[in-house]
A protein has these predicted regions:
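An internal, acidic/charged active-site-proximal segment
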Residues: 320-325, 348-364
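Conserved P-loop NTPase catalytic core
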Residues: 355-379
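Catalytic nucleophile serine of serine hydrolases
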Residues: 337
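Short glycine-enriched nucleophile-adjacent loop
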Residues: 344-345
Length: 501
């Protein structure tokens, strides 16, 4: 028997589709169904590496965890990773197939319809229910003929759609009605209900609006979800402007850590765990501060989807000089993936993998050289920190080979790669340990490594060490999500929409 399906679409980006999808995944998992998530096409530089080395969006990996299953590439068969304002690396079934402009991708896209359909059908054959997430809005007139993620997917099997609107942004009734008006009659018929998301205050104040909406559209409101602070769910796409547009003041009673906000930053979720630490203030730095401002306790160069371009940006923006000033004043400096490459002396791109720039000088804080290669390394790893034996679990996503000088000790020893026992060095550290880099994304998610490193920074301040923090587990977050469905959705209407087994 083919699986049932339900689809979550939205009136726009950032209205809560990913969270609602995860909540439905967890709710139906707790109801005893075998559930899987699906998103036909995702655009994000925050990716996840599956056990077999494929790349998918992190949101689908999180949703799979909510379902109690391992993520596979079929859950997100097409992933677009922007490498510039005009081009993206196209990843199909977990593997890169090339870098394309929007026009090139639109010409290529018809080949992906069957990939999306086959992936959805494979999941449908294996699970009782597939919870499908759309992207952006289904009513983008200029993009509808290229659709492989919204109504085109819903129409493949007549999947019922729930439309989500964000009342916190204002104008939610106009967004919901306007979105419906821009759909054709077949698409409108697939929309079964609305969700009003991120409501604050007395819900009875919405009663008149809900009655009007239901009468106007002849569609029911499935539920009104409250605004929930600090769900501890990773951002699917770019870092929200709220995190960097208004600079946070330095807190002298806490560790102040600065992440350089590169134009093509990737895997910014690497720093979410740091941000949740009670003794840390995390700052995203988009421009060089004035010379008299106090210096941080740590500067981090993050991953980049376009390392050569972002290295050029560091120089043109003055941030390279700022990092050098921090280093000269004995501030520790760390680099993750592309940031690790930038810390070296030289970056070479003889094949033009990243750009037309064949050679660039790095920041010169570590004695190492990187050569970009055509083959992309994507693998899940287990490792331990050299000298401290803190275990970390993470993943590598890069297209470069870095050769540190023999005198530089490695930062980590990788002990397992895609489930196979190995023994190889990763990263490098300066002789005094003040500058270090690694190819491993997710190292700060390891509680003991994170706390031991933060305690080393605290020691530099003359402060006592702290124990590892008890961050909310995924299970706790999933329970919160399932409770949102149980407490705020019309259960009878939800069962009617999903249908009988």
């Amino acid at each position: 028997m083919s699986a049932r399906r339900i689809m979550v679409q939205g009136t726009g980006s950032y209205v809560g589709k990913s969270v609602v999808t995860a909540a439905l995944c967890r709710y139906f998992h707790e109801e005893g169904l075998r559930v899987a998530p699906f998103k036909g096409q995702n655009m994000s530089n925050n990716s996840f590496v599956t056990l077999d080395g494929g790349e998918i969006g992190r949101a689908q990996a999180f949703q799979a965890a909510a379902c109690g299953i391992k993520p596979v590439v079929e859950m997100n068969p097409v992933l677009l990773k922007p490498s510039s304002d005009r081009s993206s690396q196209v990843v199909v079934l977990g593997k890169p197939v090339g870098v394309m402009s929007a026009r090139e991708y639109h010409r290529y896209q018809p080949q992906l319809v069957s990939v999306v359909q086959n992936s959805l059908e494979q999941l449908s054959d294996e699970y009782d229910l597939v919870v499908i997430e759309g992207a952006g809005s289904p009513a983008e007139i200029n993009l509808r003929k290229f659709d492989i993620v919204n109504m085109a997917v819903a129409k493949m099997h007549g999947t019922p759609v729930i439309l989500v609107g964000d009342i916190n942004l204002g104008g939610v009734f106009a967004w919901l009605v306007g979105t419906l008006e821009l759909l054709d009659s077949e698409e409108r018929a697939l929309v079964r209900a609305f969700i009003i998301n991120k409501f604050r205050g007395d819900i009875s104040l919405l009663d008149d609006g809900i009655r009007w909406l239901e009468a106007k559209t002849e569609k029911k409101v499935l539920g009104v979800l409250p605004f929930v602070n600090d769900l501890q769910i990773e951002e699917e796409d770019a870092i929200p402007e709220s995190k960097w547009k208004r600079a946070k003041p330095f807190d002298p009673a806490k560790l102040n850590i600065e992440v350089i906000l590169l134009p093509h930053i990737s895997n910014s979720t690497d720093f979410d765990s740091l941000e949740r630490e009670s003794d840390v203030v995390l700052h995203y730095l988009a421009r060089a501060p004035h010379a008299g401002r106090e210096l941080p306790d740590l500067v981090i160069l993050p991953g980049s989807k376009s390392t050569m371009a972002d290295l050029g940006y560091l120089r043109s923006s003055g941030l390279a000089k700022y990092v050098a000033r921090c280093y000269e004043n004995r501030v520790p400096v760390a680099g993750i993936c592309g940031g690790y490459q930038m810390l070296g002396k030289e970056l070479l791109d003889p094949l033009g993998v990243e750009s037309g720039v064949k050679r660039a000088e790095g920041l010169g804080l570590l004695d190492l050289r990187t050569t970009f290669e055509a083959t992309k390394q994507t693998t899940r790893v287990r490792a331990r920190s050299v000298g401290h034996d803190d275990n970390v679990v993470g993943y590598e996503i890069h297209m470069g080979r870095t050769e540190p000088a023999d005198s530089l000790p490695p930062m980590f020893e990788i002990t397992e790669e895609s489930g196979r026992a190995v023994g190889r060095a990763d990263g490098a550290t300066s002789e005094d340990g003040r500058v270090w880099g690694t190819y491993i994304h997710g190292v700060f998610d390891a509680p003991h490594f994170r706390r031991n490193y933060l305690n080393a920074l605290r020691q530099r301040r003359g402060w006592n060490p702290l124990p590892p923090s008890a961050a909310a587990s995924d299970a706790t977050v999933f329970d919160t999500l399932a409770a949102l469905v149980r407490n705020h959705f019309d259960a009878d209407l939800l069962r009617e929409i999903v249908g009988d087994p």
